[in-house]
Design a protein with these regions (language model features):
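Acidic catalytic motifs of isoprenoid enzymes
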Residues: 1-192, 199, 203-218, 222-233, ...
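Primarily interfacial, aromatic-capped hydrophobic alpha-helices that serve as membrane anchors
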Residues: 229-272
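Cysteine-dense, membrane-associated helical/juxtamembrane modules
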Residues: 266-335
Length: 335
């Protein structure tokens, strides 16, 4: 998954889509500059959302500058690659990869286990640099590592709380924006938002991994809990996420963040088990043919490598954002 958070629709948010793109590509630039050129490929929507939150709650305006991302021959566009929230998101992204590889080396076997161990060794210098950067900002790195180490304990003692380690880690990561920006009064709301985000990430991954986990005999909470219990947990967590997002006092980009929340809900409708309106049902029913006719991109663009923008447009007419062949593009409910 490229991230739980859905990217905004380029048509519906045409005025603010450059903000998402500038944050996404600013994050990619930090990853490349600080942790190696290949590290830019780690850029993802969840980390971009974290960076955008910081840009939006900061009373000081972003430091936009014209730059390119992955294609030096592209036309420069506004990015922010020095804001504390962006550099924080980059550091936790690198550490997140290290955690993922560590989990894979523990859970997998054969070639995948070997590849995970090799990958961990290769990224070790970048991880060390990311941890050092986090420590210089008073981020509780050791505490988060301990939280993640408790994962198996939560799984063994209470499957319904198997999401606890991920929730606490995301909560700590998101709440640290308050420390970085000198906004201690926002820490509770940010922690609530991050914790809910982490729980949703955990349950979505578990939902997606049911078949491989069953095949390999790995723990999955869906094998140990009644579906109604899981549904209630997910829906209450989604309610926490949306309420926390609403409670934050944004100085800018509030419309974009609201749309991202709506688009994320639409993207995960089946997983969330939420009721859809009649209009949404009709829209989903007819969307596949329309999107195939229009080029299959659903009008999203995060976007870095293809949209920088040397690749030919698919379909006829439209801008890069309208015909972008980028990462998989989630369909927007308002197309």
């Amino acid at each position: 998954m490229f991230g739980f958070i859905a990217s905004p629709c380029a048509r519906c948010t045409s005025e603010s889509i450059p903000i998402w793109r500038g944050t996404f590509c600013g994050l990619a630039r930090v990853l490349a500059r600080e942790y190696s050129a290949p590290a830019r490929l780690l850029v993802n929507r969840d980390a971009t959302f974290l960076a955008l939150l910081g840009l939006s709650i900061d009373p000081s305006p972003p430091n936009w500058k014209n730059a390119t991302c992955c294609n030096p021959l592209a036309t420069p566009y506004p990015v922010d690659d020095i804001h504390p929230a962006v550099t924080h998101a980059a550091a936790v992204t690198v550490c997140g990869l290290a955690t993922k590889l560590g989990d894979d080396s523990h859970d997998e076997g054969g070639l995948r286990k070997l590849l995970s161990k090799s990958g961990s060794a290769l990224i070790s210098p970048a991880v060390g640099k990311a941890i050092a950067r986090l420590n210089t900002t008073s981020f509780p790195t050791a505490s988060v590592i301990r939280q993640l180490a408790d994962q198996e304990h939560h799984e063994a003692t209470s499957p319904i709380q198997a999401d606890e380690a991920t929730a606490r880690s995301f909560g700590t990561i998101t709440a640290h924006l308050a420390e970085l920006l000198g906004l201690p009064q926002l820490k509770p709301e940010l922690e609530k938002l991050g914790s809910a985000h982490g729980r949703l990430v955990y349950w979505r991954d578990a939902w997606d991994d049911q078949k491989p986990d069953l095949k390999k005999g790995r723990f999955n909470p869906y094998f140990h809990l009644d579906p109604s219990v899981i549904k209630e947990r997910i829906q209450s967590t989604w309610a926490d996420f949306t309420s926390a997002l609403t409670e934050l006092p944004f100085h800018r980009h509030s419309q974009l963040l609201t749309h991202i929340g709506e688009n994320t809900r639409h993207r995960h409708t089946d997983f969330l088990g939420l009721e859809t309106t009649t209009g949404e049902k009709k829209n989903r029913k007819g969307k596949r043919g329309k999107n195939e006719k229009d080029g299959g991109c659903c009008n999203h663009c995060d976007c870095c490598i293809p949209c920088d923008c040397t690749m030919p447009k698919r379909g006829t007419g439209g801008s890069c954002f309208d015909r972008c062949p980028c990462d998989g593009c989630d369909c927007c409910p308002c197309n």
